[in-house]
Amino acid sequence: MAEILERSGYLVKVRVEVPADRVKASYEALLKDLASRVRVPGFRPGKAPLKVVEARLGREALLQDLKERLVEETYPEAVRELGLSPVAARVVEQDLSEGEGFRYVAEVENYPEVRLPDWRSFALEVSPPEVTEEMVEKALEELRQRYAELVPVEREAQEKDHLFVRTEEGAEFPIDLAKALPHVREALLGKKAGDVVMVPVLNDKGEKVREVRTEVLEVKTLKLPELDEEFAKTLEAESLEDLKNRVRESLKRQAERAYEEARERAFLEKLAEGLEVEIPPSMLRAEERHLLEHLAEDLYRQGISLEAYLEALKVKGELEKFQEDLRKEAEKRVRIALAREKLAEELNPEVSEEEWQAYLQAAARAYGVSVQDLRRQFGEEGLARLKERLRQDKAVQEALKVLG
């Protein structure tokens, strides 16, 4: 039998009573299970009498194991019976007496109740997309940069040049002066083919530890193609004007996507800010751990451990700010997740089979696998979460249409 003793926001105090006959049956099952695994001198494995096993293991230890087993068995039944959706729980009281039932009290952090703000009255302050001629010209210039060629020049090296050099050890390699370390760039600027220069090598503190004799073999510069009809045709445009129109249309599509994404972001942030909810601490801690795991993965790819990164923040006196920012970001993400979930519950959009299949195909492409492999990797529960995410996406889009 289970009953709610006290309820305050997300925190629910629950009392569970287990009848004596079930306690007795669980104790006997526990003893038999242990007897099959415990070695008792003078008996073959699994053949020692239960009383002997009980005496060997000690009744107090057995009763502690019994309490844990009973909680494991009855807690899920109790929360189902009471209609709770726990995110965390702990047992705060236990009472197990000889020949009687087992009673315990658990403090449950229940999934929070959420109330949305009046989102239909939202005014989203997002500037509409605009594509200027200046943006078109910049995009065309970037195209020229992308199709530029390196050509040799017989002059001194300038800031954006590329040098091909050979060290005294015989190693030959190119150096892009625009991306070179400042002390390397300084040593090579103004040099031409045939010049020999001593390039300093610095330690972690920026101190010179030695010099490397380096010969400049060749100086090259980027030659940009002319923005003309011929260049347009190399990009499969019919004319220069056609190329400009294509670039303009591409920029408009990008601007429209950015605008829609900005509207969605502004809507969700406003929705989350106005959410009436008391979030259980365990949900926030879980999201903080999730964020730290992602950070650790990013740092690992750079050859840095999370521990070393946090220690460096501590040395610089920035650890407290990092932790505070982490807490704020975790709360923001949890609030947005709860807001999306509640909005989908309110609008209840339907996901057609065609939409679901298209979503699966897009997800499979993103993961670089087939739809069949995606289904296998995600499993039934993972696919259910994926479908719920699609349903929530549809709810957000429906809400944005309402706002116009």
Swiss-Prot record:
GO cellular component terms attached to this protein's record: cytoplasm
Source species, domain of life: Bacteria
BP-aspect Gene Ontology terms: 'de novo' cotranslational protein folding; cell division; chaperone-mediated protein folding; protein transport; protein unfolding
InterPro entries named in the record: PPIase_dom_sf, Trig_fac, Trigger_fac_C, Trigger_fac_C_sf, Trigger_fac_ribosome-bd_bac, Trigger_fac_ribosome-bd_sf, Trigger_fact/SurA_dom_sf
EC number: 5.2.1.8
Any single Pfam family the record assigns to this protein: Trigger_C
Protein keywords: Cell cycle, Cell division, Chaperone, Cytoplasm, Isomerase, Rotamase
Catalytic activity annotation: [protein]-peptidylproline (omega=180) = [protein]-peptidylproline (omega=0)
Family: Belongs to the FKBP-type PPIase family. Tig subfamily.
NCBIfam families noted in UniProt: tig (TIGR00115)
Described function: Involved in protein export. Acts as a chaperone by maintaining the newly synthesized protein in an open conformation. Functions as a peptidyl-prolyl cis-trans isomerase.
Domain notes: Consists of 3 domains; the N-terminus binds the ribosome, the middle domain has PPIase activity, while the C-terminus has intrinsic chaperone activity on its own.
Record-given protein name: Trigger factor
Source organism phylogeny: Bacteria, Thermotogati, Deinococcota, Deinococci, Thermales
